[in-house]
């Protein structure tokens, strides 16, 4: 089958002819329709320090997808051939304490589709049926293909009660922008998102952010005054992994504020802990999606009128995958979709 693989320990990604995966007793075989390029895939493409330590070669990569069930193992229940599905890319062990307690997203033995095992940038993908999520008929293939990153946004944004709150999001990548849309949809008052990429800030404006702030030109403190906020932000969603952005967030949080962190900062990031301690801030780390509460919330948010379509800015045939990666790497895009049909 046709597949995009990381063949060599160097920058790049390659179209290959890979063997069709075999279906185990508890697995689904999914014929891929659409995939989306994730920031993780860009790290793998660039072969940065994280990728060099994490990614085996050769391996089929990719983990954002939608497809159709074409075969299944003999033990599978609840699915049928023809079902349209996406899936949770974190494969969990089922026997650690967190798995047995129902906190599956905190499994300490997690492996990742397209990271530690064969991925979705291929004509066919095998995953455990447990990880598959049926897509409702009124949700498009395009939106279903980005459920994985949308889930990161939903998990982060809904970590705390947002109704009537003032929310600061640092980092206007696709996940940060989707988090802004979620926050407005569920009833936040002011949603302010910051970045230095004007293209993506404009996308955030289209998606409903109260203010999209280019911090190269404008101070958050001035935006707070302009919006009539007298006590700082109630909720912070850190999506950038940039130390200066995180410290700016801490400076502008209200006392008793809550911060959810999805962005991965450098390991040696300096933090002004006085801001955390004396303001009584709560900081929560976010990894992946809650299984499978986040997935049901994603579908319900879209069905209740949340419009994510503006975040999908480019689509390419899989044969033009290089153009898709180039566009994603340029930073002048939202989500980039590769079509396998």
Curated annotation (Swiss-Prot):
Name the catalysed reactions: L-threonine + NAD(+) = (2S)-2-amino-3-oxobutanoate + NADH + H(+)
Query: Which Pfam family is one of those matched by this entry?
Result: ADH_zinc_N
Q: Which cofactor does it need?
A: Zn(2+)
UniProt: Zn(2+) 1 binding residues: 38, 63-64
Q: What class of enzyme is it?
A: oxidoreductase
> What's the subunit arrangement here?
Homotetramer.
Q: What is this protein called?
A: L-threonine 3-dehydrogenase
Which organism is this protein's natural source?
Answer: Pseudoalteromonas translucida (strain TAC 125)
Recall the taxonomic lineage recorded for the source organism. Answer: Bacteria, Pseudomonadati, Pseudomonadota, Gammaproteobacteria, Alteromonadales
What gene is this protein a product of?
A: tdh
